[in-house]
């Protein structure tokens, strides 16, 4: 009888493990292969070799890149060097990147590890760049003032809060105010790995201002990219491991109400809102297994989606670019400027294409 009970327990454990492993593979889209979609006249951005996890294009074509991210469980081609913020002018015939010098003695440059970024332009045309930073595996938001003539960033402030333990991306709504996604509930790398493996869906979105901080949405399986509609009425949130983009209605008190959900056959990362049309441009990972378990012989592919009329009953979703990793590995972000598409990756290169 004891042997039968033991055998039954072993069988149950194995069945649960097999079922959970299948669920984990589904969340990572482990068996997805890429069908290539090409664009004309694509060129790699010179000077980006260790990723451009996020990017922001100003109305005048100046573009900020967040580069050199070191993230637990993700490949890094230069793990010993700090990250950088790069600048590129998309109006140039052959645009090239240059490093923005960080001014001020309040930021430890040696541990600078930039992730998501967002800009806010004040009424006097002052441009603030808000940067998610992971110094020593922690999470902060660094507030910079962009000094265009000097081509530098003046560090103004470091923001930390207990409700911001694992920030991934931010959407700035003021010089020190923003919505932020926490991709995990825990900050500890060991607990984060179990949280992700078990699919606990404990990540959330937080509204932060100097006067008020609150969780405004929760229950996500790895909340990732976030964007705000052109009219400021809606917030878009990418749920990476559920393959979803959520649309929320934004209220005057900064709370959010869920409106609709779109499902995809890819892991949706950062969201950029087209400044002309309001379309969403989304950097995606077709196969998440290849991102989290990197193999140079079988690298992660890249995919860019365009979502038109997202608020309608029948949004139009187009795969604008897709590639199996021979050119671009691990796309995280895509944005447009005057008929050009700029694509960034988590640890690899960046691409610049005609549309």
From Swiss-Prot:
GO terms for cellular component: spherical high-density lipoprotein particle. Gene3D superfamilies: TolB, C-terminal domain. The active site is at 115 (proton acceptor). Glycans are attached at residues 253, 270, 324. Hydrolyzes the toxic metabolites of a variety of organophosphorus insecticides. Capable of hydrolyzing a broad spectrum of organophosphate substrates and lactones, and a number of aromatic carboxylic acid esters. Mediates an enzymatic protection of low density lipoproteins against oxidative modification. InterPro entries: 6-blade_b-propeller_TolB-like, Arylesterase, Paraoxonase1, Serum_paraoxonase/arylesterase. It is found in: Secreted, Extracellular space. One of its GO terms (biological process) is lactone catabolic process. It catalyses: a phenyl acetate + H2O = a phenol + acetate + H(+); An aryl dialkyl phosphate + H2O = dialkyl phosphate + an aryl alcohol; an N-acyl-L-homoserine lactone + H2O = an N-acyl-L-homoserine + H(+). Disulfide bonds join 42-353. Pfam families: Arylesterase. Its EC number is 3.1.1.2, 3.1.1.81, 3.1.8.1. The preferential association of PON1 with HDL is mediated in part by its signal peptide, by binding phospholipids directly, rather than binding apo AI. The retained signal peptide may allow transfer of the protein between phospholipid surfaces. This is Serum paraoxonase/arylesterase 1. One of its GO terms (molecular function) is phospholipid binding. The gene is Pon1. Ca(2+) 1 binds at residues 53, 168, 224, 269-270. Binds 2 calcium ions per subunit. Keywords: Calcium, Disulfide bond, Glycoprotein, HDL, Hydrolase, Metal-binding, Secreted, Signal. Ca(2+) 2 binds at residues 54, 117, 169. It comes from Mus musculus. The signal sequence is not cleaved. Homodimer. Interacts with CLU. Its cofactor is Ca(2+). It is an enzyme of class 3 (hydrolase). Plasma, liver, kidney, heart, brain, small intestine and lung. In the plasma, associated with HDL. Belongs to the paraoxonase family.
């Amino acid at each position: 009888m004891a042997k039968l009970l033991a055998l039954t327990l072993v069988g149950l454990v194995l069945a649960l493990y097999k079922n959970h492993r299948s669920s984990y593979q589904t969340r990572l889209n482990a068996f997805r292969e890429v069908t290539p979609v090409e664009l004309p006249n694509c060129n790699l951005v010179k000077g980006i070799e260790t990723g451009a996890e996020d990017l922001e294009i100003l109305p005048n074509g100046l573009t900020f890149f967040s580069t050199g991210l070191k993230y637990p469980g993700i490949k890094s081609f230069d793990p010993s060097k700090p990250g950088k913020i790069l600048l590129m002018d998309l109006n140039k015939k052959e645009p090239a990147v240059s490093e923005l010098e960080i001014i001020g003695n309040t930021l430890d440059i040696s541990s600078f590890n930039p992730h998501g970024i967002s800009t806010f332009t004040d009424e006097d045309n002052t441009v603030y760049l808000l940067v998610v930073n992971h110094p020593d595996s922690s999470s902060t938001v660094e507030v910079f003032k962009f000094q265009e003539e000097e081509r530098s960033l003046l560090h103004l402030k470091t923001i930390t809060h207990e409700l911001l333990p694992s920030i991934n991306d931010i959407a700035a709504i003021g010089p020190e105010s923003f919505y932020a996604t926490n991709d995990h509930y825990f900050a500890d790398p060991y607990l984060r790995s179990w949280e992700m493996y078990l699919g606990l869906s404990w990540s959330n979105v937080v509204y932060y201002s100097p006067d008020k901080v609150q969780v405004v949405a929760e229950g996500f399986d790895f909340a990732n990219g976030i964007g705000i509609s052109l009219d400021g009425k809606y917030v878009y949130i990418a749920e990476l491991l559920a393959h979803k983009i959520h649309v929320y209605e934004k209220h005057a008190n900064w709370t959010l109400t869920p409106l609709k959900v779109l499902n995809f056959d890819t892991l949706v990362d950062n969201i950029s809102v087209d400044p002309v049309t309001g379309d969403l441009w989304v950097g995606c990972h077709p196969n998440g297994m290849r991102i989290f378990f990197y193999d140079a012989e079988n690298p992660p592919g890249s995919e860019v989606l365009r979502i038109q009329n997202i608020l309608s009953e029948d949004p139009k979703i187009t795969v604008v670019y897709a590639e199996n990793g021979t050119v671009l590995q691990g796309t995280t972000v895509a944005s447009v400027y005057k008929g050009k598409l700029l694509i960034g990756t988590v640890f690899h290169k960046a691409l610049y294409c005609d549309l």
